[in-house]
From Swiss-Prot:
NCBIfam families: bioD. Homodimer. It holds the Pfam family AAA_26. This is ATP-dependent dethiobiotin synthetase BioD 1. The keyword Acetylation does not apply. It comes from Salmonella typhi. Its EC number is 6.3.3.3.
Length: 228
């Protein structure tokens, strides 16, 4: 049976893609046929191949099972803004059925599929649909990425509570160091360990620029996912 997970974050720009690439690397090292899925991405650049999003490209590079870009990222928008705004501006509605069909296609080929969200847990995809709604429909186990910075404890607790209220399993969380560790770093991590009701899969240290291109799988331990 295919293992499937959804990666969400405490906010936008907290390292979801860095963590997702690390997860794909670690799962590949365990022998899985892996693929990353970024169903909706805003903030893309025009290339000779069309609009391309850097996060989706990173997932494509770190998947062990080669896939065309369109399979990794069915909805690509140019402006780096909330997907429901970008889709309205471009006159291209986001259809939840398209997201689900894309996921089914990948699940039929890989045995470890990781879906990365956009922004935070409740990011709107339309006036009536959030990413959380779709994840709940798909019943995906959730992995939370916490960007370790001031305010992250509150954001982590709120997100974990929202996942719980959606009736979904929070199967793990990842600490992503967004800057060199400060004086209170250890206390932040200790508090996060205490208040997040899920196992810590690992801490990705501050790596500077282009962390999604680094060998980050080494920082994770997926054994809690294997036991779940």
């Amino acid at each position: 049976m295919t293992k499937r997970y959804f990666v969400t974050g405490t906010d936008t720009e907290v390292g979801k893609t860095v963590a997702s690439c690390a997860l794909l690397q670690a799962a590949t090292q365990l022998g899985y046929q892996t693929v990353g899925y970024k169903p909706v991405a805003s903030g893309s650049e025009m290339t000779t191949d069309g609009l391309r999003n850097s996060d989706a490209l990173a997932l494509q590079r770190n998947s062990s099972l080669p896939q065309p870009y369109s399979a990794i990222n069915p909805y690509t928008f140019a402006e780096p803004t909330s997907p429901h705004i970008a889709s309205a501006d471009e006159g291209r509605a986001i259809d939840a059925a398209v997201l689900s069909r894309g996921l089914r296609t990948l699940e039929a080929q890989a045995d470890w599929v990781l879906t990365e969200g956009a922004g935070g847990w409740f990011t709107p995809l339309s006036a009536t649909l959030t990413f959380a709604d779709w994840v709940q429909t798909e019943q995906l186990p959730v992995i939370l990425v916490v960007g370790v910075k001031l305010g992250c404890i509150n954001h982590a607790m709120l997100t974990a509570l929202a996942v719980e209220q959606a009736g979904l399993p929070l199967v793990g969380w990842i600490a992503n160091d967004m800057q060199p560790p400060g004086a209170r770093h250890g206390e932040y991590l200790a508090t996060l360990r205490r208040v997040i009701p899920a196992p810590l899969l690992g801490e990705i240290p501050w790596l500077g620029v282009s962390p999604s291109q680094a060998a980050t799988g080494q920082y994770l331990d997926l054994s809690p996912l294997e036991r779940a």
